[in-house]
């Protein structure tokens, strides 16, 4: 029987760059954009002669990229070897497969027969990403449709993916696939790890918070293996906020010490994988996460300006280089940025508390402010509670404006477009619109989709305004849930909603 797991994409509201270093925190929102992994056997029965095999088959299918890859999995070493003619590889999924199977070996040390049988049947793995992870502007424009969420909604679910055109000068400034910056590799890696661990009986995704086979929650096991797979696939130990969000959902995140993965980086070519994973699972994972979500009646919107995305690793590298060349200025910038990030976090938490304690007043204030530009919000500060709510709203805006200024200063000093001029103009006009609390460039910034937090029902007007500025509002919203077990193949569950969809070539 097939196992289907999914994991969400992310939006890093605050903590861009700073989240790379402890103890700086990042506020990260999980979204309704999800990556799915479907795991089932290639063969329904184990062939009698297969018990003597030293290898088994693994098939990896990515329908959106029209790619199918075949591998042989060594049953002794748990390593994958590609046997496909195509040289297109997916290191994230390959590492996820190897480390999930290594964890399964570790978890079933006393009873390997059932695991061995599952592996001998072969592994048929399909990966699917929500359309929101990818840019479909070109197809929409080619079809002569307006740049609106409604046009996006006409796309068939899990539509074919757009590739960025190569630069005329051969430069590789954009990723191969046109993306929106929602952390597709982290969501994909997490979904594959979770689906395989559930399929192989290591975790139970129907109750993932209980203590599992390794003395910690099943979610923690998924997190550790997904982080390891993702970091080794990237060739570096990142902050991990994107994987943490994919596993646990929306949160306030402080990174783990990179040393916890240094053993895996060194040992990956020499030691058996189950030994490496054993050390990882026993390691001191000191990441910190606290539940966080937007205050009530606030909505996340993302707008794609149509630049095909940015290369995050090269931007991070440039910022690190600047830190080393001008440490004093960099420290001052980061301290100010950390203070502004904390201020915004505090204001949003205060608003959540005010909503809980004074719901009726909060509801009226948000409704009133949703149809006004921010300079007119004070007109509704007629009573102490109203005034307190509006004060927090305005101070949250001020904190975001400070964050943007400091991020721009960092970008200028490091010679990277963290908030490029085109994005600045778009963000300024967005923040001056009715009912918009704040707007910014998520994560590392650049030319990815921008985000806005709106009040009440003001989002519709914002998406119309974006469309008139040639910005495509995505269908992404905040969804606080992390990795989960799905009831079936998402392509079949989407059929009813996709009956009226069209296929854009």
Swiss-Prot record:
> What's the superkingdom here?
Eukaryota
Listed A to Z, the keywords are: Acetylation, ATP-binding, Kinase, Lipid biosynthesis, Lipid metabolism, Nucleotide-binding, Peroxisome, Steroid biosynthesis, Steroid metabolism, Sterol biosynthesis, Sterol metabolism, Transferase
Q: Where in the cell is it found?
A: Peroxisome
Where is this chain primarily localised? other
Q: Which Gene3D superfamilies match?
A: 3.30.230.10, GHMP kinase, C-terminal domain
Keyword presence, Kinase: yes
SUPFAM superfamilies in UniProt: Ribosomal protein S5 domain 2-like
User: Does the record bear Nucleotide-binding in its keywords?
Assistant: yes
Q: Which reaction does it catalyse?
A: (R)-5-phosphomevalonate + ATP = (R)-5-diphosphomevalonate + ADP
InterPro entries tied to this protein: Erg8 (IPR016005), GHMP_kinase_C_dom (IPR013750), GHMP_kinase_C_sf (IPR036554), GHMP_kinase_N_dom (IPR006204), Phosphomevalonate_kinase (IPR035102), Ribosomal_Su5_D2-typ_SF (IPR020568), Ribsml_uS5_D2-typ_fold_subgr (IPR014721)
EC assignment: the record states: 2.7.4.2
Q: Which residues carry this modification: N-acetylalanine?
A: 2
- Which residues does the annotation say bind ATP? 177-187
* Pathway entry: Isoprenoid biosynthesis; isopentenyl diphosphate biosynthesis via mevalonate pathway; isopentenyl diphosphate from (R)-mevalonate: step 2/3
Molecular function GO terms recorded: ATP binding; phosphomevalonate kinase activity
Question: Motif Peroxisomal targeting signal PTS2 at which residues?
Answer: 57-65
Name a single GO cellular component: peroxisome
Coiled-coil stretches are: none
Family to which this protein belongs: Belongs to the GHMP kinase family. Mevalonate kinase subfamily.
What name has this protein been given in UniProt? Phosphomevalonate kinase, peroxisomal
The source organism is Arabidopsis thaliana
């Amino acid at each position: 029987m097939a196992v289907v797991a999914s994991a969400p994409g992310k939006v890093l509201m605050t903590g861009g760059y700073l989240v790379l270093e402890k103890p700086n925190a990042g506020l990260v929102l999980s979204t309704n954009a999800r990556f799915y992994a479907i795991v089932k056997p290639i063969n329904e029965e184990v062939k009698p002669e297969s018990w003597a095999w030293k290898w088994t088959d693994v098939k990896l299918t990515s329908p959106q990229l029209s790619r199918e890859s075949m591998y042989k999995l060594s049953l002794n070493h748990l390593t994958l070897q590609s046997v496909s003619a195509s040289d297109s590889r997916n290191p994230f999924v390959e590492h996820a497969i190897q480390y999930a199977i290594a964890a399964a070996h570790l978890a079933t040390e006393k009873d390997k027969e059932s695991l061995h049988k599952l592996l001998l049947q072969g592994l048929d793995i399909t990966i699917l990403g929500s359309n929101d992870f990818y840019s479909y502007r070109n197809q929409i424009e080619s079809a002569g449709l307006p740049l609106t969420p409604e046009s996006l909604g006409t796309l068939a679910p899990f539509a074919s993916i757009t590739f960025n055109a190569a630069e005329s000068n051969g430069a590789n400034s954009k990723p191969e696939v046109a993306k929106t910056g929602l952390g597709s590799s982290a969501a994909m890696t997490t979904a594959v790890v979770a689906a395989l661990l559930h399929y192989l009986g290591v975790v139970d995704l129907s109750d993932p918070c209980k203590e599992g086979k390794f003395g910690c929650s099943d979610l923690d096991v998924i997190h550790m293996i997904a982080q390891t797979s993702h970091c080794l696939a990237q060739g570096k130990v990142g902050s991990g906020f994107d994987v943490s969000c994919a596993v646990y959902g929306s949160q306030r995140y402080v990174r783990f010490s990179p040393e916890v993965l240094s053993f895996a980086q060194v040992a990956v070519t020499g030691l058996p994988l189950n030994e490496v994973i054993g050390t990882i699972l026993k390691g001191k994972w000191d990441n910190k996460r606290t539940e966080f979500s937007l205050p009530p009646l606030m909505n996340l919107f993302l707008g794609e300006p149509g630049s095909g995305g940015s290369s995050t690793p090269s931007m991070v590298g440039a910022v690190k280089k600047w830190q080393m060349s001008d440490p004093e200025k960099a420290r001052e910038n980061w301290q100010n940025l950390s203070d502004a990030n904390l201020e915004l976090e505090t204001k949003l938490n205060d608003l959540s508390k005010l909503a809980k304690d004074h719901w009726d007043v909060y509801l009226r204030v948000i409704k009133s402010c949703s149809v006004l530009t921010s300079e007119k919000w004070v007109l509704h500060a007629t009573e102490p509670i109203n005034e307190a709510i509006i004060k927090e709203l305005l101070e949250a805006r001020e904190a975001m404006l400070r964050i943007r200024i400091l991020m721009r200063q960092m970008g200028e000093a490091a010679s990277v477009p963290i908030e490029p001029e085109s994005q600045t103009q778009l963000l300024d006009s967005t923040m001056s619109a009715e009912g918009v609390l704040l707007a910014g460039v998520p994560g590392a910034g650049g030319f990815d989709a921008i985000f806005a937090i709106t009040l009440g029902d003001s989002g519709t007007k914002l998406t119309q305004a974006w469309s008139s500025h040639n910005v495509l509002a995505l269908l992404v919203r905040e969804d606080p849930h992390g990795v989960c077990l799905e009831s079936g193949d998402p392509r079949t569950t989407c059929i009813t909603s996709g009956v009226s969809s069209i296929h854009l070539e």
